[in-house]
Amino acid sequence: YRFKKTVKEEICSLIEGFSLPEQYVGCQIRGGDKFIEYDLLSVDLYLRKIKEVTDLKNVFVLTDDYEIIKCLRKMAPEYNWFTFCQSDEKGYYNSAFSKTDPLLKRKRMIHFFASMELLERASLMLGTITSTPCLVLGIRKLGNVHWVDFEKNEFFPSIDYSIAKKKTLTEQFLRRK
């Protein structure tokens, strides 16, 4: 993908104004309407994985629900949590987003694209196969993604799996943990 010049400039400006350290972990934790397709993954699952794979204490989180950020800060205050998610965001619901004011919709999309760029730049990333942004970044970052709900060596075959099959595999993986 390639951004239009004006969009790229907005993304770059947003990132430049963000005081993120050079070395950091990136992850996406979904809320909102994702529960329609999959059970939402617990914040604790991400915290355990971060502690398992790195000593880094700076974490950028792409999320659509500010409650997740509040929960992370409460559960792991020793970490520095970064996000573009605003305190009024309570999860992405497609039906509501489609009715959002165009200027606010554009702002949220710029934040999303900037978040994707920051996840791609992360020293390492935590992802889930139940999330399209994570799947895209999993392909782009190849070996630099740690899956919270899947074995690393099973990733590429999973790209073509149906939602139902991914859900089943994720549930089986989490039961083994």
Where are these regions (language model features)?
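Short, surface-exposed amphipathic charged segments that create phosphate/polyanion-binding patches used
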Residues: 93-104, 161-168
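Residue-level detector of alpha-helix boundaries and kinks
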Residues: 57, 103-107, 122
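A polyampholytic, Gly/Pro-enriched intrinsically disordered region
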Residues: 99-112, 172-176
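Low-complexity, intrinsically disordered/propeptide-like segments
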Residues: 17, 116, 121-122, 172, ...
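Short secondary-structure transition/capping segments
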Residues: 69-75, 104-115, 134-135
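Leloir-type glycosyltransferase catalytic cores
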Residues: 153-177
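Core catalytic architecture of nucleotide-activated donor-dependent transferases building glycoconjugates
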Residues: 1-97, 110
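A donor-sugar binding/catalytic signature common to diverse glycosyltransferases
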Residues: 112-154
